[in-house]
Amino acid sequence: MNFTGDCLLYAGYEKLSLSLAVVTILIFSSSLILNISALVIGFYTTAPGPMKMYLINLIVSDILFTVTLPLKIDYYYYFFNWRWGEMACRIMSFLSYINTYVSINFMTWISVNRYYAVTRPHKYNSRDNIMRTKIACACTWVIILVPMSSILFVSTTSSDHETKIRCMEYNKVGDSMYLPPWVTIVMCFIGFVIPFAMMAISYSAVCYTVLSGISKSTRSYRTCKLVACILTEFVICFLPYHASVISYMIHIITSKTVLCENVSYYQMLLHATQCLMKLNCCMDPIIYLFVSSYKSKAKSNSIKLMFK
């Protein structure tokens, strides 16, 4: 497999760059308001429990990533020109990957938690699960943080023929990957495909239990809706990006020559699908507010008033 050499990745994509900047501004504004609101409501209006712990961890991850979005807005506004130095690029990239895979893992934990709550209600005890939930949360952060921290120690910027500095992008096709394509595919399989399969199985079991009448409580129906919302968010936010990465890695493995225009298209596709991934920062707090709204009638009314 051969590469075509130096490549101007973004020739002709000026309008798309500005569109990405506008979309990211909207995501940043919405995410900041929603996540801070959800965090405040979470601390003051809901009792401790596994669901709260998972969702609070999601929100913390979203906030950490949201504060880096102004840098991404600047990058898009100046037509993919990074003006903030090497370390800022590393930190932004690090938090982006952390948010993606921490979110995927906690969304998977939530679905599994709901699976046991609905299909094994006699064995499920929220209080007994709190310690296990704490351990799961701690392990999730460690497992994601340790390998991703390598990003902080490698160069993440590069320059091209236009004398612009790119962040986490490469003007030479042959430099477009840190890892061999097959390793990237394996990582996508572990980080996305397996969690997606677990969520789909949990969702199917929950809905089967509820719709078959095995568990007829109102709470069970709400759980079915919750897991469906989480699965929908998962598909919208994370499936396009990982499908794009996997398909391109397969293209590299199977093709004798990778053309510049293919790489350019892939880079823009990554930016577009990454915008979809950023949407999870807005959707996570909405799901949290959805869950919190059922705790009591008074709390439900206060949450609804926020959105009038």
Swiss-Prot record:
It comes from Fowlpox virus (strain NVSL). It is found in: Host cell membrane. It is a multi-pass membrane protein. PANTHER family: G-PROTEIN COUPLED RECEPTOR. GO terms for molecular function: G protein-coupled receptor activity; oxysterol binding. Keywords: Disulfide bond, G-protein coupled receptor, Glycoprotein, Host cell membrane, Host membrane, Membrane, Receptor, Transducer, Transmembrane, Transmembrane helix. Gene3D superfamilies: Rhodopsin 7-helix transmembrane proteins (1.20.1070.10). This is G-protein coupled receptor homolog FPV206. PROSITE patterns: G_PROTEIN_RECEP_F1_1, G_PROTEIN_RECEP_F1_2. SUPFAM superfamilies: Family A G protein-coupled receptor-like. The chain crosses the membrane at residues 21-41, 53-73, 92-112, 134-154, 181-201, 227-247, 271-291. Glycans are attached at residues 2, 262. It comes from the Viruses. Disulfide bonds join 89-167. Residues 42-52, 113-133, 202-226, 292-308 are cytoplasmic. The lineage of its organism: Viruses, Varidnaviria, Bamfordvirae, Nucleocytoviricota, Pokkesviricetes.
